[in-house]
C-alpha cells in the first residue's frame, strides 16, 4: 500500500513542500526567516481577527474601542500588543530575510525575488493602514502626511488623494476603507507567499556557498523542521518578552492621545520599520522627488539581479563585497536613526549623505567592487 502522504491530493502538496522536499545540506540559520515570516503572518491574521471582533471603524468610537479591547475584553491587552509588536517582529524577519537574499545572491531566482519585493510592498501597505486604525494623533497625522504625498503626482495628484480620502481630509470614510483594506491585504499576502514558495520550489533553495547543491541534498523533515522549530521558539520568546515586559517600547506615546485634526504633533513620524524610507523621503527638498526616492528605495531591489556583475553568486568568498554590504547595513541603521529625528541641523545633512550613500552603494559601488574582485581572481 502506498503511503497516504504521497498519494492523497492535498497531502502530497504538503509532503513535497515540507516533508520530502530535497534541501541543500549546508543552509545556515539565515534560511530560517522564511518559516518565521509564515508564523508571523499566521499570528497576525489570528490576532487581527480577534481584534476585528471588538473594533469599530468609526472616527467617534475607534479610539474608545481599542481602549475597550485593552481594558474590558478577556486578554484583550495581550491580543492587541501581540498584534502591534508582532508587526515589528514581522519586519525584523523581513529585513533579515531580504538581507540574506542580498548577501548570498538569492536574487538570482528572478521570479521568487520579484514576488518577494511585491510581498514587501504589500506588507508595508498593510502595516501603514493598520497603524491608522487606533485613531490616535500619530495615526491621524501619519495617514494625512503619507496619503498627501500622492498629491505630488502631476495632473491627477489632487484628485487621487481626495478619492483615497473619500472627502477633503482624512475622516470617517478614510478610516472605514483603511480597515477594509487592512483586513483583506494579509490574505492577499498569504496568497502571494504561496506563489513565492511555488517559484522557489521550481529551482530549490540557494545555499551559503552559492554553488549548485544538487549532488548533496537532504530531506526537509526532520533536519530542517527541527531547525525551524528552534528558530520559531527563539522568535516567540523574543516576542513574548517584548509584549509582556515593554509592550509600548516601539510605539509612539502620541498615539495614546485621541486624533485631533486641530492640533499637529511636534514630530510626525511613522513606526520604526518605515523610518529609513521616511529619512530618504525627507532628504529631498522637492515633493515629487522625495516621493520618487521613497518608492525607489524599495523598488530598487527589483533591479539588483541586473546589477550582479560578480563571477560568484554568493558574497561568501568576496571579502570586498562583504565590506560594502555591511557598510550598506550601517547606512540603513543611520537612515533609521535620522528618520526619527527632527528636521534640523545636523540631522538634515546626515540624512542627505546617508540617502546618497544608500543609492550610490547599490547602483554603483557594489557592482564596481564585484568587477574589481573579478579582476583579482585572475592574479
UniProtKB/Swiss-Prot annotation:
UniProt-annotated location(s): Mitochondrion inner membrane
GO molecular-function terms, A-Z: metal ion binding; ubiquinol-cytochrome-c reductase activity
Cofactor binding note of this UniProt entry: Binds 2 heme b groups non-covalently.
PROSITE patterns: CYTB_CTER, CYTB_NTER
Statement: the UniProt record of this protein carries the keyword Manganese: no
Membrane topology designation: Multi-pass membrane protein
Binding site for heme b b566: 97, 196
Keywords, in A-Z order: Electron transport, Heme, Iron, Membrane, Metal-binding, Mitochondrion, Mitochondrion inner membrane, Respiratory chain, Transmembrane, Transmembrane helix, Transport, Ubiquinone
GO biological process annotation, one example: mitochondrial electron transport, ubiquinol to cytochrome c
Any one annotated GO CC term: mitochondrial inner membrane
Binding site residues for a ubiquinone: 201
Pfam families membership: Cytochrom_B_C (PF00032), Cytochrome_B (PF00033)
Binding site for heme b b562: 83, 182
Gene3D superfamilies according to UniProt: Cytochrome Bc1 Complex, Chain C
Membrane-spanning intervals of the chain: 33-53, 77-98, 113-133, 178-198, 226-246, 288-308, 320-340, 347-367
Cofactor: heme b
Keyword presence, Transferase: no
Subunit structure: The cytochrome bc1 complex contains 11 subunits: 3 respiratory subunits (MT-CYB, CYC1 and UQCRFS1), 2 core proteins (UQCRC1 and UQCRC2) and 6 low-molecular weight proteins (UQCRH/QCR6, UQCRB/QCR7, UQCRQ/QCR8, UQCR10/QCR9, UQCR11/QCR10 and a cleavage product of UQCRFS1). This cytochrome bc1 complex then forms a dimer.
Note from the entry: Heme 1 (or BL or b562) is low-potential and absorbs at about 562 nm, and heme 2 (or BH or b566) is high-potential and absorbs at about 566 nm.
Family: Belongs to the cytochrome b family.
Function of the molecule: Component of the ubiquinol-cytochrome c reductase complex (complex III or cytochrome b-c1 complex) that is part of the mitochondrial respiratory chain. The b-c1 complex mediates electron transfer from ubiquinol to cytochrome c. Contributes to the generation of a proton gradient across the mitochondrial membrane that is then used for ATP synthesis.
Protein's UniProt name: Cytochrome b
Gene name, Swiss-Prot/TrEMBL: MT-CYB
